[in-house]
Amino acid sequence: MRKVLVFLKNSKKAFETFKRVERVLKDLNLSYKKFINRKELFKVLKPKDYELFLVIGGDGTFLSAARIASRFGVPLVGVNEGRFGFLTEIKKEEIKKVLPLVLEGRAKLQERLMIDVYLRSRNRLRYLGNYLNDAVISKSSIARIIRTKVFINGEEVLEVFGDGVILSTPTGSTAYALSAGGPIVYPESQNLLFVPICPHTLSNRPLVLPSKFEVKFKVVSENMEAFLTLDGQEGFHLKKGDEVIVKRSRYVCRMYSHPRKSFFGILKEKLRWG
């Protein structure tokens, strides 16, 4: 591995952590380039420019980088400089010992499923992008329930009365979907996860689906505005009749897992699981 792109959060702590990372890169004689601005990165990056995206920040920074790196098939590894760090698995205290193992190719390379999201509004279909975690339709600031029809492979399967709905990837199953009562899905599984948010009907339960299925949500609430949030970072206002279509993306997120920790170990450490 010879060319590394360092993508970091715009914060003082992230810059301090970068100094530690920089020393490791220099010790291994690796060339690197540092980026902070996502838009700038998208403009200058070309396929196969780099062999690794090294992300310094929290899970939000990692999700943002994943949408870019997946387009070029470049693997990522995350160094945590946020509050939680479920995706940015390497702690800053571990940089000197653990990061070289990744850079030398001694860590496991995973392929994580991503989703493509489309919005149909006023008979116009628009592609919104590819995402690693989830698509969430939720109510606006007014404290009323919203009605959302759910279609799976073209068949209307239910109508949810509640605070909204989540369509998650296995990676996203430990994010908002988990808080809403969904199951934890092993991150390399090939599934989609549907989770209703605070449904007003006891029979509306989470559902695990094959990744080849297409899921469509239609907002049917009268005079109620809903909101679509993608990976917790991009948002769109929705009105009655708008449809959100989610399907498996042709892009995948390639990422190195922590060479000394398993997924279950991270669950125990981060979520106190087990």
Curated annotation (Swiss-Prot):
Q: Specify the protein name.
A: NAD kinase
- Matches recorded under PANTHER family: NAD KINASE
Active-site feature positions: 59 (proton acceptor)
Instruction: Please explain the role this protein plays, according to its UniProt record.
Output: Involved in the regulation of the intracellular balance of NAD and NADP, and is a key enzyme in the biosynthesis of NADP. Catalyzes specifically the phosphorylation on 2'-hydroxyl of the adenosine moiety of NAD to yield NADP.
Q: What is its EC number?
A: 2.7.1.23
Instruction: Tell me the protein family, please.
Output: Belongs to the NAD kinase family.
One biological process term in Gene Ontology:
NAD metabolic process
Q: Which of UniProt's keywords are assigned here?
A: ATP-binding, Cytoplasm, Kinase, NAD, NADP, Nucleotide-binding, Transferase
Q: Extract the GO molecular function terms from the UniProt entry.
A: ATP binding; metal ion binding; NAD binding; NAD+ kinase activity
Its catalytic activity?
NAD(+) + ATP = ADP + NADP(+) + H(+)
> Which GO CC annotations does the UniProt entry carry?
cytoplasm
User: What species is given as this protein's source?
Assistant: Aquifex aeolicus (strain VF5)
Q: Does the keyword Cytoplasm apply?
A: yes
Which cofactor does this sequence's record say it needs? a divalent metal cation
| Sequence positions that bind NAD(+) | 59-60, 133-134, 144, 163, 174-179, 233
Please state where this protein is localized.
Answer: Cytoplasm
Gene3D superfamilies the UniProt entry points to: Probable inorganic polyphosphate/atp-NAD kinase, domain 1, Probable inorganic polyphosphate/atp-NAD kinase, domain 2
Which HAMAP family does the record match to this protein? NAD_kinase
